[in-house]
Amino acid sequence: MLPLIANSCRITVLKLRKKEIMTTVSAIEFDAKSGNYFCKVGSKTIKSYSKPYVERRVKAMVGDVEVAMAAAVEKSNRYDINTRFGFVEKLVNMVATGVQPSAVITGEGGLGKTYTVTKTLEANGYKDISDLADFQVGSVINSRRCFTMIKGFSTAKGLYRTLFENNKSIVVFDDCDAVLKDPVALNLLKGALDSYGKRIISWNADMKDDDLPRSFEFTGRVIFISNMDQDRIDQAIRSRSMMIDLSMTLDQKIDRMEFIAKSDEFLPEYDATIKADALALIRKIKSECKEISLRTLIAVSKVRASNKDWKDLATYMLTA
């Protein structure tokens, strides 16, 4: 059990996932005016005329954080990060084959979530129609074997239009976290993500002079790729979707980057030795780096390939 802290301080209990599980414990003080002892634990204040009671409550609350830490550590150790990315492929396969209408994939950006989803869909024979300019005029497109990527999308009405225009297809929402926070958009998604019966999506607001229907049956499928923590996503979405959490520790990020760097598709213009040297430097100074992602590895690999005395420049870029 963590000891009761005699003065105000921050205790970092866990730095395992994207966010830290931490608590701030203040000193126990006495308020002469009210006759109560009080102590702040995080955002909560414990108050009582009995100092031993306050001490017991503080120790219990800090203990709860320790329990959460232990559970998170156990879960993380059970499945390594590359295994979890393999789970993403399996889940996307289920969406592609119509077994599952929706999936939510969460975790920090820049480590291959979008790449894994798109490559898995393409491996299942789906075409990316995100940019219709890539197709010749008059081309026949089988919408049931297509997917479209939506980025930076913000309004509920925009969501309604997107689902209507891409009905029968797979819609991939990439980093559209605003949609997951909008109450109206969430209600629309509930209809789109249900896994039983007809999925009817309705828009009750005035649509005068608009080409959208008031309601329609959605027969497509949805994949969300989000940088949000899984527990911040609305319960209604979580209960209707299958979810994979790709939150990573610093070491897991580098393990994932090492796995990707060994692929022939990653920076094929550079020798494997160059990528290995770049990765070794990142691993050495990982705790000092401002950011660690595939973009980091790409940047350091370029510096390694272009400069004989490359380490100082690369270190400066990563840490300054």
What residue ranges belong to the model's regions?
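Conserved catalytic/switch belt of AAA+ P-loop NTPases
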Residues: 181-218
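Short N-terminal "domain-start" leader segments
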Residues: 4-38, 47, 79, 89, ...
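Short glycine-rich substrate-engagement loop in P-loop NTPases that contacts/grips substrate
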Residues: 127-170
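A short helix-turn-beta junction within AAA+ P-loop NTPase domains corresponding to the substrate/partner-engaging
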Residues: 232-251
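Conserved AAA+ ATPase small/helical "lid" subdomain
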Residues: 264-319
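N-terminal pre-Walker A segment at the start of P-loop NTPase domains
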Residues: 69-96
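Structural recognition of the conserved hydrophobic beta-strand(s) that form the central parallel beta-sheet
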Residues: 172-174, 200-204, 217-227
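Walker A/P-loop nucleotide-binding motif
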Residues: 98-117
